[in-house]
Amino acid sequence: MTAKHDIAPPGAPPGAPPGAPAGPSTGRPSRRSRGLGTAAARLAFLGPGLGYLIVLLLVPLALVLSYTVFRRGRFGGVVYEWTLENFTRLFDPLYFDVVLSSVKTATLTTLAALLIGYPTAYVIAGLPRKWKTIALIAVVMPFWTNFLIRVYAWIILLSGPGLVNEALTGIGLIDKPLQLLYNQGTIVTGLLYSYLPLMILPLYAAIERLDPQLREASANLGARPARTFWSVTFPLTVPGVLTGCVFVFVPCLGNFVIPEILGGGRSIMVGNLIRDQFLKARDWPFGSTLALAVIAVLVVLLFLQAWASRVYGGTEGRRA
Amino acid sequence: MPRRRLIYVPFWATYVFLYTPIIVLVVMSFNAGKSPYVFEGLSLKWYGELAGNDTIRQGLVNTLIVAVGTTVLSTVLGTLLAVGMARHTRSRLLDALGLLPAVLPDLVLAIGLLVFYATIKMTLGLHSVILAHTVFGMAFVAAVVRTRLTHADTSLEEASRDLGASPLATFTRITLPTLAPGIAAGALLAFTLSIDEFVIAFFTAAPTEPTLPIVIYSMVRFGVTPEINALATILLAVSFTVIIVAQRMTRLTESLS
Amino acid sequence: MSRIRYTRHLPAATVAAGLVLALAACGGSSSTSADGAAPSAAAEQLNPNADLSKQSLTITIWDGYSPKDLADQVKKKLGFELKTAIHDTNETAMAKLTANADSGIDVAFVSGQYAQALNEQGLLEPLHSELIPNLANLYPEAAQLSFDKGNKFSVPYTWGTTGICYRTDLVKTPPTSWNDLLNPSADLKGKVTMMTTERWLALPALKQLGLSINTTDDKQLAQAKDLLLKAKQGGMLYDDTTFGAKLEKGEAALVEAWDGWCPTTNPKIKFVVPKEGSDLWSDTMVIMKTSKNKEAAHAFINYILDPAVHSWVGENILYKVPNKAAMDLLIKNNQDLLAKNTPLQMTPAELLKGESIVDLGEASTKYTRLATEISANQ
């Protein structure tokens, strides 16, 4: 779904995953001794892009923000009467629990992605150059076919007569097809499937940058491989881990398609609530308030990320 | 050493996980029968059906128009922005603004634009999707180009300026050619992001002009015919070709520069 | 373009009409008159002899709900271009029709209560019945639908009811009551589905309790909620669009379904209206006020009501049409189909026993909340 998070720049060199500059690992250009140019040049370069972002990004976000304190119009839109009702409603257990459980689902997916993504990235980073490229492209490849079609494929795989049940019955693990579709696990599977590469790419970038001599030094000093990993390798890759976690967590939290297609209407996430406020209930102010809650969660997350990368930052092995 | 091999388990699991659904899709697109579960023999009939499906064709045309429009707009604005941010300002705030579209959940951007278009009473159409896609397209182009700028050697630009060239001349003669591979990569990125983008298009497209992902979404909701599998297979094949070509091109441009 | 922006350039009378309209739109809760007559003050003068070939028409409709070659037919018979947009649910259509000043849609196909809501918002053009002579083909009952008595702003395209659709080979005792859906026998677990569209989600529970499907009473809705939550805990699945296909594949055994979506041409599948009663729904055609092709829009609706055209619906998608001439034609030409398809045999009198779903104004948020409570429950 979040196509914009989906794909690595095809021409970008390995080590520069999509949006990598968003991560903590890319600092400001270090060598910058020249002046900043004339005011006219500054305006010519920065003006169009910033103007565009102000009109089509900041103004819309400000509108959403301002809607949170108004009443809904009966048929969508907004009535300009002040109210704090939307915020009271946000803390209504009905909606707040959905927000909480969405955070839980997104966290679960992120952890699963980290667990499977870290070793994968680790192996890829150690491959010979040619295989490295192939392995990386293979991680990105699935993104090149439509997101919705890929999600749909999971219905075929997991349904009663589907491949997974066939396989499980075939090897004798079960004797009767399991109900694999339409539950929380299915949603996590779908989310994991959709965003796993967003975890692998920044992890790969972080691991690849490590100086192998560090590990050798640690081993030479008598550390066991496990100890080397936990006390040397892992801390150095924490910034990459954090970037990957943000990349996975963010699109998971706002998702509404996967719960809808793979959840069988039995569970919803905050994305569904927001979508429904705009497209079904036509309650734009409350939809905006829910969106604000999502933004709030993300701001907390980004602060955590900044804090953690500062704690682990400053160590060698990262590009300054 | 067993410990060493253990790490290969998640590695291979990742690829099995990523590719099983895709293999199923591709195989089933050649299925003679209608059932998504039982393979009843080889046939190209779903590709034929697909070719005759006007809704999908129209969606594809709309998607291509949007993607091309987005690419052009994003590339121009994104490149200028990247150069501007790297060479003409040191504002951290601007940095953050430039990256905001990349970290903002697409749903939030989508409803923001929906509200905005409704407020200014803009009639929706392909143009409204292009404007929306450019918001994130530009951010990604800027990000890719900046990566290149940061690594680029600035001495040529400085020399050009010291020799009295105008900022414009410096930009067109020196900066742009240096950045060309980055710009090309950014453009390709904007194009592919736009082609597969669903959520923002879903909120900002006119009902009369759905893009391909919107068409697919409504088809999936009504239960899928193997036509969808055929479509997926074709998209996959096209993407594969594009990747190969892109790889070749970057290698070519890199060896030239 | 917004009607209100127009008014600057129009004579005083129209300005006044426009103001009434604007007030009606902004007033919100102030009035929800049942006959919906208020906004029709702003009726426009239409030219019955307009050159249709200079117009073009955009409609929005459910996928597969009209003949594939409809555009060609219209071009040939009426002389203008027809463009078709697809919506998957009423809500999607409503979102598009209400979000912006001009959606680009001339004629929309939406269910009755949604037509009513659009009209209350002042978004619909009152029908000029003199431009739709084929209205005479409709059953007299078709003008009695409570969301729009007298067809002032909507023309029913199809009508029917909601019931239980089931596989005779997978369900041991044929269902007769909504309780058989809400509380199915243990062997059907994971094979029963309900619809999630708010009003149809509440319908089985409300009818089971002997209540009105238009109730706004909090206590009654709370009772319905309990029943629906129990059903969910019993393993209920939710499906608005693919339940027919699931029944045919055997992935589902018993589902809540609109009559026309129950694939009764399959000998193993049957449709029943539970004994507690059900609804009378109608999908209607409405003309948007923003349309710049209103003559073409009327001509289009008139064309649809032609018996030969309208009977396509019954023949191909097995929905009943409220068009007597078309149904007579259908019955004459399709004896086999009719014999196999019990829902198609229902008469207007039988249909009118069902309760019409009407728009509930502000109170409709109660149903939205109910639906959220059901889907958010784990």
Task: Report the location of each language-model feature.
Chain C
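A ligand-binding cleft/hinge motif common to bilobed small-molecule-binding domains
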Residues: 113-117, 248-249, 254-269
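Mature extracytoplasmic/periplasmic domains
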Residues: 288-351
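Early extracytoplasmic/lumenal segment of secretory-pathway proteins
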Residues: 41-117
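Conserved C-terminal helix/tail region of periplasmic/extracytoplasmic solute-binding proteins
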Residues: 347-378
